[in-house]
Amino acid sequence: RKSLIFILKSEASTSALRVQQSIDPDTGRLHKAKSTDNSRMILALTAIGKDVTNVGGHNLLAGLSDLEFVKYQGNNGPIWALLALDSGNYPVPSGGTTTRQALIDEILSVQTSDGGWAISGDRADSDMTGMALTALAPYYKKDPTVKQAIDKAIARLSEMQDDDGGFSTTYGDGKYIATSESTAQVLTALSALGIDADTDSRFIKNGGSVVDALLRYYVNGGGFKHVMDGEIDGMGTEQAYYALTAYYRFLSGKTNLYDMTDIIDMGGDVVTVEPTVPAATEPAQAAQTNIPWWIIAVCIFGGAGWGVVIGIVLVPKLNKKKD
């Protein structure tokens, strides 16, 4: 596993050097329309200890300084920007219109009337609801308005859960399809909120939990399928593993998936400290450059590693099903 992570880190470093040539020197943007390219690269570089404020002399945070640019991409823009800024507790770029509060307000402003979030329209989608909740999770105890929005979304997700414990999405045709990615996004969000997606009664349907549902997509000796009758899928595998990593980190009392402040200071440099177990998170009911997927995978799996996730989360659950 260490050899694999070393290779991935080396490849990510090489890719980061190539990305330098794609940065607009005037704006710090990696893409003229997609702010998420900056956000995701910030996450990836933070995970491997690279200084995001000096990528070939350019500050990737600056690419997120214009709120209108961040919002231009739709709901994904503010969500990923907030995740990126919080990943290393980065200061908000100066001289711009983006602030953490502005990002939070924008996310809250597009909550659907039924309680979740959507790519477009006013009908909650499990994927976008999961992503929004993951970004807002750190503010649950700090902001009553955020708490109210999250509580409403948690209730909506429980209602949206499929009869087997999984989640479905629609591709705009009105038909819902159960996918591993939808289930993975919900698992990631619940883990960030301190909700056990394997035992919380709100997320168990007919004896099946969110974790149970996700593991049904697993292919022995391989990865995860996108849909139940499909084959191993790259995106399905990526999202399932990082969701399980998020769940592992929740069970272990570590920071949530995108919060790297336990090992990385606000400057993006790795510090030699042992991660500490944070106080338990209050469950909601109680209180033109496309970044390769494997770069983001470094960010995701660096905190635990595939072997750890499989050994602690996946194997016991699969064995339990055989008993």
Which residues does each predicted region cover?
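Asp-box/WD-like beta-propeller blade repeats and closely related beta-sheet repeat scaffolds
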Residues: 60-74
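An alpha-helical repeat/solenoid feature that recognizes helix-turn-helix modules
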Residues: 1-2, 26-53, 70-96, 100, ...
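Ser/Thr/Asn(+Pro)-rich, low-complexity disordered segments
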Residues: 2-3, 313
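C-terminal low-complexity, Ser/Thr- and acidic/Pro-rich disordered "stalk" regions positioned immediately N-terminal
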Residues: 251, 255-293
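C-terminal membrane-anchoring or membrane-association module
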Residues: 302-323
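Helix-turn-helix repeat elements of alpha-solenoid scaffolds
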Residues: 3-13, 53-59, 98-99
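Alpha-helical scaffold repeats of the Armadillo/HEAT/TPR superfamily
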Residues: 59-62, 98, 103, 149-153, ...
